[in-house]
């Protein structure tokens, strides 16, 4: 019997999550019929001595030459905006920075490229508990509202614009940095609110304009990341009763860390689910 073909994985970004995924694929990939196709990082010197030189991709424009079946972006939203279409034209694409999809042009282009290529645009659920249920409610037309509150220590945020100053002022007191549509938050916290962006993709009937995001900076939680999710469904006309779900996720995190500890394992599970689901968006 011939050996089963291994799925070839290209990893774009070699930060904390990228390194974790590369190491997992090298150590355990054979158990899941997968192998590394390439690794790319903006600073190539970071790969020196850590990644086989034969697997180091120098130019993302040449990604098609490496025959990857799945490309995983864990670098920065700008990579997905610039190269997402290219990735989807040659492979399935797991977008680890879904805040990039808050840009309407980027989302539309990637959805269309997935449709035309037949490759799947995967969105990892990350810290979003109940993503599949939220998606099902959206599909049924019963999802009426979704609110996500994310709380971290001030030093765990990487922020842009006006939120930088607001966060600096939050070093002594719990402060709500932002409350409003997630679309407006993504450019201000592109590395911190991927969970909210994933929620917007799952709750596609509400989208980035309808899902409410609340970002809280709290100096009293140096080693935790909190995600509170409030889902509102339909109302029973006769009684006025409203369906609702509330979940609270408490994720241990190293001090000053952007990524909580449980997120790494969640991302690995998402990667294992990327087996090809046709030319569409798939929450995993």
UniProtKB/Swiss-Prot annotation:
SUPFAM superfamilies: Glyceraldehyde-3-phosphate dehydrogenase-like, C-terminal domain, NAD(P)-binding Rossmann-fold domains. It holds the Pfam family NAD_binding_3. It comes from the Eukaryota. GO terms for molecular function: aspartate dehydrogenase activity; NADP binding. GO terms for biological process: NAD biosynthetic process. InterPro entries: Asp/hSer_DH_NAD-bd (IPR005106), Asp_DH (IPR002811), L-Asp_DH (IPR011182), NAD(P)-bd_dom_sf (IPR036291). Belongs to the L-aspartate dehydrogenase family. PANTHER family: ASPARTATE DEHYDROGENASE DOMAIN-CONTAINING PROTEIN, L-ASPARTATE DEHYDROGENASE-RELATED. This is Aspartate dehydrogenase domain-containing protein. It comes from Xenopus tropicalis (Western clawed frog). The lineage of its organism: Eukaryota, Metazoa, Chordata, Craniata, Vertebrata.
């Amino acid at each position: 019997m011939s050996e089963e073909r291994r799925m070839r994985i290209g990893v774009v970004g070699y930060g904390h999550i990228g390194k974790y995924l590369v190491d997992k694929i090298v150590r355990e990939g054979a158990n899941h019929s997968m192998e590394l196709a390439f690794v790319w990082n903006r600073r190539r010197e970071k790969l020196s001595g850590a990644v086989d030189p034969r697997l180091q991709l120098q130019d993302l424009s040449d990604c098609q030459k490496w025959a990857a079946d799945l490309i995983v972006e864990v670098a920065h939203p700008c990579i997905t905006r610039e190269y997402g279409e290219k990735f989807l034209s040659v492979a399935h694409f797991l977008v680890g920075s879904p805040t990039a999809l808050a840009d309407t042009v980027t989302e539309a282009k990637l959805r269309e490229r997935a449709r035309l290529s037949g490759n799947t645009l995967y969105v990892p659920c990350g810290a979003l508990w109940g993503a599949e249920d939220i998606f099902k409610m959206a599909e049924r037309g019963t999802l009426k509202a979704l609110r996500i509150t994310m709380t971290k220590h001030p030093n765990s945020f990487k922020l842009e614009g006006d939120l930088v100053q607001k966060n600096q002022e939050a070093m002594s007191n719990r402060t709500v940095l932002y409350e409003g549509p997630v679309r407006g938050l993504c450019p201000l916290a592109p590395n911190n609110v991927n969970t909210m962006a994933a929620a917007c993709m799952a709750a596609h009937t509400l989208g980035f304009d309808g899902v409410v995001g609340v970002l809280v900076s709290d100096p009293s939680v140096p080693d935790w990341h909190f995600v509170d999710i409030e889902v509102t469904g339909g109302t029973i006309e006769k009684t006025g009763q409203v369906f609702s779900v509330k979940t609270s996720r408490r994720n241990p995190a190293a001090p000053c860390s952007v990524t909580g500890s449980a997120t790494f394992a969640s991302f690995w599970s998402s990667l294992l689910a990327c087996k090809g689901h046709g030319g569409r968006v798939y929450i995993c």
